Amino acid sequence: MTGSAPRTARERARAEITAEILDAARGYLATDGAPALSLRAIARDLGMASSALYRYFKSRDELLTRLIIDAYDSLGAAAEACEGTIDRNDLAGRFAATCSAVRDWALAHPNEYALIYGSPVPGYAAPADTVRPASRVTTLLLRITVEAAAAGRVPEEDIKDAEAEPVAAAIAPIRSYLPPGVPAPLVQRALMVWTNLFGVVSFELFGQLHNVVAEPRAGRDAFFAECIRRWTTFITGPTVSS
């Protein structure tokens, strides 16, 4: 079996310095926010010449893009790992695990979450290569939705919706990043839950639930658990008692 060639000393050094730059940038996200991110300031903090840092990232926007992709991939990996521990036939359990993993990741990584789901960074336009990483959770929710429909858990009229053509046109931008052949109403169904999920998580992280949901954490936990229960019924159908 042929393995990959070992990295050269130069490649290892580049990887280490790149990691240091990204760590420093995440520090700025925590203390100053994404709009204040500056390659010159990071270079100064790392004891590097600005010209040297530009050999790793050509611009602030390129660094932001890397941070955004890394954050989306970290979130997606966390959701996929949690969902992957649940029995494949337990659609409700897989859906609930995905939702819980999203919230847990967001609470553990508030600055990265704010970067990808908070206020847009002035002057920055995310390139197309951020879309696929951003779609990982959506794809996971869609997969569960499709399996629920195949198992007869989604009403037939919801799959063959009379409004399918307008829906298909409306969601055309995201469909190219999702598994092909899925009926538009099912994509719409998954997107509805996706926006609900991230809306609730964003409200919690950004303080909009203050004076709405009881503190301490137990109150927010109970509120989120009830949201999951209702979303699960929408996606996988009502729980069948044994």
List the predicted regions and their residue ranges:
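Helix-loop segments that flank and shape redox-cofactor active sites
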Residues: A81-N89, V121-Y124
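Short amphipathic alpha-helical interface segments enriched in basic and hydrophobic/aromatic residues
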Residues: A30, G76, E80, R103-L107, ...
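Short hydrophobic/aromatic patch on the recognition helix
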Residues: M48-F57
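Short helix/strand-bridging catalytic loops that position acidic/His residues to coordinate divalent metals
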Residues: Y117-T130, N211-A218
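Basic, helix-initiating cap at the start of DNA-binding domains
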Residues: M1-D32, A36-A41, D45, K58-T65, ...
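Amphipathic alpha-helical segments that line or abut small-molecule/effector binding pockets
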Residues: D23, A92-N111, S135, T139-A149, ...
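C-terminal peripheral helix-coil segments that are non-catalytic and often amphipathic
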Residues: T2, T139, R143-S242
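Alpha-helical structural segments
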Residues: E16, E20-G27, E62-C82, A97-D104, ...
